[in-house]
Amino acid sequence: MCGIISYIGKREALPILLDGLYRLEYRGYDSAGVAVVASDGQVGHVRTKGRVEELAALLAARSVKGSLGIAHTRWATHGTPSVENAHPHTDCKLSVFVVHNGIIENHAHLRAALLREGHVFASDT
């Protein structure tokens, strides 16, 4: 199982996203991550293998601010539990951040096409 939460509004996104992840903990998971977009367009992106409290500790050491974000808890169906396989995933230019729940059936085709275009993958999922 996994949990996905997002926020867009006038308040700081991070506390809302973390609260949502804490509320989803009962579903079970092996890793967690968050991406928050700041007003200048920069993205704070943190992932960890482990609990939401570990993610919160990593975030406390960084300045991740913004009013738009997405967060995810993951239970591995493909790839081992690791920081690299935790969501949000990003493209190699750090311009697109993606979370998903489940299996992307055509992942091999998509991966092959993106590799041909020169993209670099950092995860097994």
Mark where each language-model region is.
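Conserved short alpha-helical segments that host acidic/polar catalytic motifs at enzyme active sites
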Residues: M1-T125
